[in-house]
């Protein structure tokens, strides 16, 4: 059974250990991690960032990291292990986002599957950023969900 929990510095898992796990999950899902373990640790230590974890028998199978301000939140990263995709885990993680704030995210223009998922989560395309991603260089689609639509 999949369990969701919000991670915090006071959790029983050390930041460096969790950062390494998240980097490995990103590598497994995307084949190239957009973040190093050090970058993940830095993101986790920031007071403006939050992290929700999806676990199966205490094994990490997915996560969502977002940054929050007074009026909006931005999805920084979401990933679910391939063997667990299509089981509603990403939607359950997305449900952890605040509903009283606008939500923003960027997604690769070629990632049609992710865009379809985000649209299902009431995100709409609002803009495009040229050459936002590297390795390979690619445009980003910027999406937004209005507050109280989550």
Enumerate the language-model features and the residues they cover.
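Acetyl-CoA-dependent GNAT
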Residues: 2-13, 19-83, 91-96, 146-149
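Conserved beta-strand positions that form and line the central face of beta-propeller blades
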Residues: 53, 65, 128-131, 142
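Conserved active-site tyrosine of GNAT-family acetyltransferases
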Residues: 118, 123, 143
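C-terminal "cap" of GNAT-fold acetyltransferases
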Residues: 3, 7, 108-112, 131-150
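Conserved acetyl-CoA-binding loop-helix of GNAT-fold acetyltransferases
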Residues: 80-99, 112-120
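Conserved hydrophobic beta-strand within the GNAT/NAT acetyltransferase core sheet
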Residues: 75, 103-107
């Amino acid at each position: 059974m999949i369990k969701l929990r919000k991670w915090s510095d006071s959790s029983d898992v050390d930041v460096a250990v969790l950062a390494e796990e998240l980097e490995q999950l990103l590598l497994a899902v995307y084949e190239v991690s957009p973040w190093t373990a050090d970058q993940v640790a830095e993101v986790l230590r920031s007071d403006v960032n939050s992290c929700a974890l999806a676990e199966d028998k205490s094994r990490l199978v997915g996560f969502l990291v977002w940054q929050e301000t007074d009026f909006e939140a931005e999805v920084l990263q979401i990933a679910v292990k391939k063997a667990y995709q299509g089981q509603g885990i990403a939607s359950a993680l997305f449900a952890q986002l605040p509903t009283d704030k606008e939500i923003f995210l960027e997604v690769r223009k070629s990632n049609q599957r992710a865009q379809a998922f985000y649209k299902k989560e009431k995100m709409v395309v609002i803009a495009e950023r040229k050459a936002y991603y590297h390795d390979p260089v690619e445009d980003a689609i910027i999406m937004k969900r209005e507050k109280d639509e989550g």
